[in-house]
Amino acid sequence: MNLLVELKKAALVFLVALVCFDLVPTIQAVSPPPDGCYPNYTTAEGCNALQHLGAGIGNTGVGWYSLFSAGNSNFNTGVGAGTLVLNTGNDNTAVGFTELLLNTTGADNTAVGTDALALNIGAFTNTAVGSFAAQNNDSSGAGHANFNTAVGGFALQANVDGSENTAVGAGALGLAKRGRPQHRGWGGSRRLHHHAQ
């Protein structure tokens, strides 16, 4: 009786193993499988992501044309369609759809949310969190709109050349086109508070 029980257990284990080995080649998470890693600690996934990467290191491009023109830039992360598409600057992070779209030489920028910092060209050390936050920052290309922080949808949206501004809340300082240095704004677009230091 003991021998019969042992044979049944062995047969069951054999059948389970056979089924597993038969199914393993057909199981895949995605098709086609991810491309894997590239030289210099770089990762790319998506149509034309990191297409023109040169000697740049530590870049991650995920999404359609993400970091397309990266060249020799370093330590950039673009996640989402069109993020950092023209970027050649360093240390930028863009997550969403078309964040830092026109950024070329700007560095140390962070954009999270649809069209956040989308028109920034050469300004640096800006943070925008929320849809359309700081959307027009440095759209003149002069590189003067630096050290700005915009948190909330449409916060600091119209800023072109103002520097050292902080806007927190939906629409905060959204209409300030050429803000003076160190403006602070909080609240929604209906209740806009601002304070210049």
PLM region spans:
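Glycine- and small/polar-enriched repetitive beta-structure motifs of secreted/surface proteins
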Residues: 1-197
